[in-house]
């Protein structure tokens, strides 16, 4: 009688544990990859944006060192660029082409890899000076090349004059 009662009690506990295991999803099923968490942040940026077009991930900086806890905020840095897709279409940004001369934003903050908690703290700022810096670099490079050519010609003339007076 005692063994039947113990067996019945053990059976109930086994059933409860089985039900609990089925109801609570595993932690690995809830964890996102670093890239997935960043893509979720880009989606959130598009949801909260009042701009006409969607943004798409352009560049993702290296992920931080591995951390076993998906709920721990991870530092993140990435760049997004404006696409040709209008926001109201809600097309997945990955399917949209980048807009020529579209806006580029540098985003920094923290994400978690936990799908349930999902706290994001991301700030994005438009990179306005990229075109200006590029033009300035090209201008200085061109001027430097021209200056170098002039100095070379002056040096050659000095050498020619030196040879002329020595002969």
Curated annotation (Swiss-Prot):
From the record, give the cysteines joined by S-S bonds. Answer: 85-96, 107-124
Q: Which Gene3D superfamilies match?
A: 3.10.450.10
Per its database record, what is this protein's job?
Answer: Exerts antimicrobial activity against both Gram-positive and negative bacteria with minimal inhibitory concentrations ranging over 1-4 micro molar. Its activity appears to be mediated by its ability to damage bacterial membranes.
Q: Which GO terms describe its molecular function?
A: lipopolysaccharide binding
What is the annotated signal peptide range for this record? 1-29
What does the entry list under GO cellular component? extracellular space
Protein name in the entry? Antibacterial peptide PMAP-37
Q: Where in the cell is it found?
A: Secreted
What is the organism lineage in this UniProt record?
A: Eukaryota, Metazoa, Chordata, Craniata, Vertebrata
InterPro entries attached here? Cathelicidin-like, Cathelicidin_CS, Cystatin_sf
Q: Record the organism.
A: Sus scrofa (Pig)
Superkingdom of this protein's organism: Eukaryota
Keywords tagged on the record: Antibiotic, Antimicrobial, Disulfide bond, Secreted, Signal
Keyword flag Secreted: yes
One GO process term, biological-process aspect: defense response to Gram-positive bacterium
Which residues, in ranges, are excised as the propeptide? 30-130
Q: Indicate the principal place this protein occupies in or around the cell.
A: secreted
Keyword Secreted attributed: yes
Family assignment? Belongs to the cathelicidin family.
Q: Which Pfam families match?
A: Cathelicidins (PF00666)
């Amino acid at each position: 009688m005692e063994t039947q009662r113990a067996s019945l009690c053990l059976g109930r506990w086994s059933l409860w544990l089985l039900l609990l295991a089925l109801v609570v999803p595993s932690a690995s099923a809830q964890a996102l990859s670093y890239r997935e968490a960043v893509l979720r942040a880009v989606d959130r940026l598009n949801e909260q944006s009042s701009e006409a077009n969607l943004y798409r991930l352009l560049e993702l900086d290296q992920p931080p060192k591995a951390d076993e806890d998906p709920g721990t905020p991870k530092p993140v840095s990435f760049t997004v660029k404006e696409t040709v897709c209008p926001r109201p279409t809600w097309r997945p940004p990955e399917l949209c082409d980048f807009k020529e001369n579209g806006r580029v934003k540098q985003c920094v903050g923290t994400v978690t890899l936990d799908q349930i908690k999902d706290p994001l703290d991301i700030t994005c700022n438009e990179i306005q000076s990229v075109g200006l810096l590029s033009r300035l670099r090209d201008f200085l490079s061109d001027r430097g090349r021209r200056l170098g050519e002039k100095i070379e010609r002056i040096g050659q003339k000095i050498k020619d004059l030196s040879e002329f007076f020595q002969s």
